[in-house]
């Protein structure tokens, strides 16, 4: 499974999960710009915890691995998450909530044995940047923010379409 075949397979395999996630009360409030800012920042903190582990595991998996070329693309989100958290005066190393802790434990297990599962997680997170760009616009108004505080949601700016195409081609 390579290239667009991998992207098509991942899209099909994650479609039901994607629909459920989009219909969750949290996601609906986020998209509508009605999520309280402290809940948004708490979510950023948990994404920081997730990316801390995911980035470490994918970096280890890429050493001599078939995914090394894919992982050469700009997928890391630590810089944006750190900047967003700093904007809101939050710590760079937040503590995980139980659900995040359980998920990052699973990421660590996959890193040791199933790097393809990590690529699936990365596919979902990278794919989410397509819609998160619109969420950033909504939150810009709702929270009276400029770019500061929204870097994680809009990491590529106007290059979003090209970056997503590059990522899928590298799969």
Language-model features and meaning:
Residues 1-171:
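Metal- and O2-centered redox machinery and metal/ROS homeostasis
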């Amino acid at each position: 499974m390579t290239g667009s075949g991998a992207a098509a397979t991942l899209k099909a395999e994650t479609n039901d999960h994607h629909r459920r996630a989009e219909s969750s009360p949290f996601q609906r409030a986020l998209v509508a710009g009605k999520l309280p800012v402290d809940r948004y920042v708490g979510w950023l903190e948990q994404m920081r915890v997730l990316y801390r582990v995911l980035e470490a595991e994918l970096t280890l998996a890429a050493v001599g691995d078939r995914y090394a070329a894919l992982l050469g693309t700009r997928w890391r989100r630590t810089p944006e998450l750190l900047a967003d958290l700093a904007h809101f005066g939050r710590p760079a190393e937040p503590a995980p909530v139980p659900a995040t802790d359980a998920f990052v434990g699973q990421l660590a297990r996959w890193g040791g044995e199933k790097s393809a599962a990590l690529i699936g997680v990365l596919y979902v997170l990278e794919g989410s940047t397509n819609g998160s760009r619109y969420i950033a616009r909504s939150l810009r108004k709702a929270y009276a923010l400029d770019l500061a505080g929204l870097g994680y949601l809009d990491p590529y700016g106007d290059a979003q379409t090209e970056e997503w195409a590059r990522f899928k081609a590298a799969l």
